[in-house]
Curated annotation (Swiss-Prot):
Species of origin: Bradyrhizobium sp. (strain ORS 278)
Gene (UniProt): coaD
Binding site for substrate: 10, 42, 79, 93
Cellular localisation: Cytoplasm
Cofactor: Mg(2+)
The organism's taxonomic lineage, starting at the top: Bacteria, Pseudomonadati, Pseudomonadota, Alphaproteobacteria, Hyphomicrobiales
A GO cellular component entry from the record: cytoplasm
Reported function: Reversibly transfers an adenylyl group from ATP to 4'-phosphopantetheine, yielding dephospho-CoA (dPCoA) and pyrophosphate.
Descriptive protein name: Phosphopantetheine adenylyltransferase
């Protein structure tokens, strides 16, 4: 049986924190699916297509180097439903701090009630990337700050261009 893991998020933009989670997650599964959430009530900075392209460009080579199959797709339903539809048995969630843990434990409990066969796996963020959030990265970029410490190199120019 192939161990498929789903790593959901908005990825707006892809950050070094996301990359850190993927670097760990590819060793936990045979196939990793990055699921880009489409929330019709939100206006993301990057289009769905741009976020998918970033995911493929940044995460694909990491998965390949680890011998893990990779795909990126979108979803606009419950995350647990997207995981079921993908055939996932694991849902990957990154944790930066205790606040993340409290929130993620609540979600994991709800998801386990709805889909008992899908296990949530918490991946602790490495120390250097713990403070990184996509919303802070967007704010720094909007104010002309240096973002290269927070996002992969291939994301720097597209992110700067959004505020040029």
């Amino acid at each position: 049986m192939q161990r498929i893991a789903l790593y959901p998020g908005s990825f707006d933009p892809v950050t070094n924190g996301h990359l850190d989670v993927v670097r760990q997650a590819v060793h936990l599964c045979d196939k990793l699916i990055v699921a880009v959430g489409v929330h019709h009530g939100k206006k993301p900075l990057f289009s769905t297509e741009e976020r998918l392209a970033m995911a493929h460009e940044v995460f694909g080579p990491v998965a390949s180097a680890a011998g893990c199959a990779f795909d990126a797709s979108t979803y606009d339903n419950l995350t647990v439903t997207a995981a079921q539809q993908a055939g996932a048995i694991l849902m990957i969630r990154g944790l930066r701090d205790g606040t993340d843990l409290d929130y993620e434990m609540q979600l994991a409990g709800m998801n386990q009630t709805m889909a008992p066969s899908i296990q949530t796996v918490f991946v602790p963020a490495s120390v250097p990337v713990r403070p990184i959030t996509a919303s802070l990265v967007r704010q720094i970029a909007a104010m002309g700050g240096e973002i290269s410490h927070f996002v992969p190199p291939s994301v720097v120019a597209p992110l700067k261009a959004k505020f040029a």
